Curated annotation (Swiss-Prot):
Entry keyword rRNA-binding: no
A single GO molecular function term of this UniProt record: asparaginyl-tRNA synthase (glutamine-hydrolyzing) activity
Gene: gatC
InterPro entries (UniProt xref): Asp/Glu-ADT_sf_sub_c, GatC
Protein name according to UniProt: Aspartyl/glutamyl-tRNA(Asn/Gln) amidotransferase subunit C
Record note on quaternary structure: Heterotrimer of A, B and C subunits.
Role noted for this protein: Allows the formation of correctly charged Asn-tRNA(Asn) or Gln-tRNA(Gln) through the transamidation of misacylated Asp-tRNA(Asn) or Glu-tRNA(Gln) in organisms which lack either or both of asparaginyl-tRNA or glutaminyl-tRNA synthetases. The reaction takes place in the presence of glutamine and ATP through an activated phospho-Asp-tRNA(Asn) or phospho-Glu-tRNA(Gln).
Amino acid sequence: MSRISIEEVKHVAHLARLAITDEEAEMFTEQLDSIISFAEELNEVDTDNVEPTTHVLKMKNVMREDEAGKGLPVEDVMKNAPDHKDGYVRVPSILD
């Protein structure tokens, strides 16, 4: 029994705005089914005596302080913006 259906694959492809053929949907269904099957095998691993791991190595990122600096004057920004109105840069709409 498949753990994922062709309809689910097509639905996810639609949500991702991907155009896939029926053959591709069938291929992805088989591939995703094998991936899910492998992930389910991990549930069978005995982890009773295993400490939870948050990081593989005992390292941590060293980052600089996040300090706000002086930005560009609004006038300079607007000079370089191809389209602006009332102190705001206008950009083309990307949402329907």
